[in-house]
């Protein structure tokens, strides 16, 4: 929005030309989103308390979690507001890639909102009926994927980048739709499963979004894309603004979500953030890199799949409890130790992921 205003005002004062620079707008998007999150946080928490939108806790979970019962949830609303306002202000809204990510972000946020609402109303952790939840997640993902495919099917935007191999970039064609669908829906649910401890999901999200800001900038820059042997996707550079908005909103939310949390993001936050990360990975053609950098999300999801599969096949559990962060809690690890160690692991994986861009 401000890009259009600056383009008009630059004829009167060339200083407004600074708004045309992605780096400037990226920093401003981060600061704007963070400022909004910090500003509206107390009011959002107060209203959630008045509405009695409190967290429900599994009765078979760690005893330390019982004290969390009643803590305001659905705090992801403040994340969505911060990202939405910041992006609308600082991004070039003529860029279709921005709208694809926002569509998934708010679409998944709506599904998460309904899921959270039913958990609160029923006073249990069941939420929205699973088949309806996955139906709507799938519909939203497929609409976005078909749109992305229609825009980029004749360009490098449907290539698959394989880490460590610079000359291996197969053209996916129609299979792009299948892969992209699973990346978006899978990442959304993986982040959702990770969101079980104070700050556990939001900090890895911030780290991965920060890395994707760098990757989006390189992907949208012809010279850097050639230098790194990655696909050049002309519209991708503008995603830097959205990535930094996610980082800023995440930092603003972390202020209130750090241990001991004053508010939880709920499914309205975790499903939407995961969906946004998955969509960004698809747009910059780095789906496999997301698996590396978001390794904590992947392991959390796999732990649930393995636990359920093992119990159905052998009537035995692999972990004391799934997702795996609860396993470590039941082993006696204090919650802050689990959280910080998962943060450290994510930082290492993100750095490894960024290094693979050069080691190819």
Swiss-Prot record:
Topological category with respect to the lipid bilayer: Multi-pass membrane protein
Keywords, alphabetical: Cell cycle, Cell division, Cell inner membrane, Cell membrane, Cell shape, Cell wall biogenesis/degradation, Magnesium, Membrane, Metal-binding, Peptidoglycan synthesis, Transferase, Transmembrane, Transmembrane helix
One Pfam short name: MraY_sig1
Pathway noted in the entry: Cell wall biogenesis; peptidoglycan biosynthesis
Subcellular location as annotated: Cell inner membrane
Molecular function (Gene Ontology), one example: metal ion binding
One Gene Ontology biological process: regulation of cell shape
Reactions the enzyme catalyzes: UDP-N-acetyl-alpha-D-muramoyl-L-alanyl-gamma-D-glutamyl-meso-2,6-diaminopimeloyl-D-alanyl-D-alanine + di-trans,octa-cis-undecaprenyl phosphate = di-trans,octa-cis-undecaprenyl diphospho-N-acetyl-alpha-D-muramoyl-L-alanyl-D-glutamyl-meso-2,6-diaminopimeloyl-D-alanyl-D-alanine + UMP
InterPro entries (UniProt xref): Glycosyl_transferase_4, PNAcMuramoyl-5peptid_Trfase, PNAcMuramoyl-5peptid_Trfase_CS
Cofactor: Mg(2+)
Function: Catalyzes the initial step of the lipid cycle reactions in the biosynthesis of the cell wall peptidoglycan: transfers peptidoglycan precursor phospho-MurNAc-pentapeptide from UDP-MurNAc-pentapeptide onto the lipid carrier undecaprenyl phosphate, yielding undecaprenyl-pyrophosphoryl-MurNAc-pentapeptide, known as lipid I.
Protein name as annotated: Phospho-N-acetylmuramoyl-pentapeptide-transferase
Organism encoding this protein: Actinobacillus pleuropneumoniae serotype 5b (strain L20)
Gene designation per UniProt: mraY
């Amino acid at each position: 929005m401000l890009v259009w205003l600056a383009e008009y005002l630059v004829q009167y004062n060339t200083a407004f030309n600074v708004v045309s620079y992605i780096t400037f707008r990226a920093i401003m998007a981060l600061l704007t989103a963070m400022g909004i999150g910090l500003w509206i946080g107390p009011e959002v928490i107060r209203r959630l308390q008045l509405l009695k939108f409190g967290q429900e806790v599994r009765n078979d979970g760690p005893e330390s979690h019982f004290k969390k019962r009643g803590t305001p949830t659905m705090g992801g609303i403040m994340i969505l507001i911060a990202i939405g306002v910041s992006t609308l202000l600082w991004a070039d809204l003529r860029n279709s890639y921005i709208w694809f990510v926002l569509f998934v972000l708010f679409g998944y946020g709506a599904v998460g909102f309904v899921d959270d609402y039913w958990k609160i109303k029923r006073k249990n952790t069941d939420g929205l009926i699973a088949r309806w939840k996955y139906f709507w997640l799938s519909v939203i993902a497929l609409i976005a994927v078909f749109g992305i495919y229609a825009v980029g099917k004749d360009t490098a935007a449907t290539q698959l980048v394989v880490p460590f191999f610079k000359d291996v970039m197969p053209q996916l064609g129609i299979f792009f739709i299948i892969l992209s669908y699973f990346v978006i829906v899978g990442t959304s649910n993986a982040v959702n499963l990770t969101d079980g401890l104070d700050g556990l999901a939001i900090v890895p999200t911030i780290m991965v979004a920060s890395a994707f800001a760098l990757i989006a900038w390189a992907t949208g820059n012809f010279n850097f894309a050639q230098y790194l042997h990655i696909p050049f996707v002309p519209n991708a550079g503008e995603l830097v603004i959205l990535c930094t908005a996610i980082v800023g909103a995440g930092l603003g939310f972390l202020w209130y979500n750090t241990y001991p949390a004053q508010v939880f993001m709920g499914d309205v936050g975790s499903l939407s953030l995961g969906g946004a990360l998955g969509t960004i990975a698809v747009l910059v053609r780095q789906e496999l890199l997301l698996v590396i950098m978001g390794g904590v999300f992947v392991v959390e999801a796999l732990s649930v799949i393995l636990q359920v599969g093992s119990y159905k096949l052998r009537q035995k559990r692999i972990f004391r409890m799934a997702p795996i962060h609860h396993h470590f809690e039941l082993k006696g690890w204090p919650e802050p130790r689990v959280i910080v160690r998962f943060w450290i692991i994510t930082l290492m994986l993100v750095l490894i992921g960024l290094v693979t861009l050069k080691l190819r």
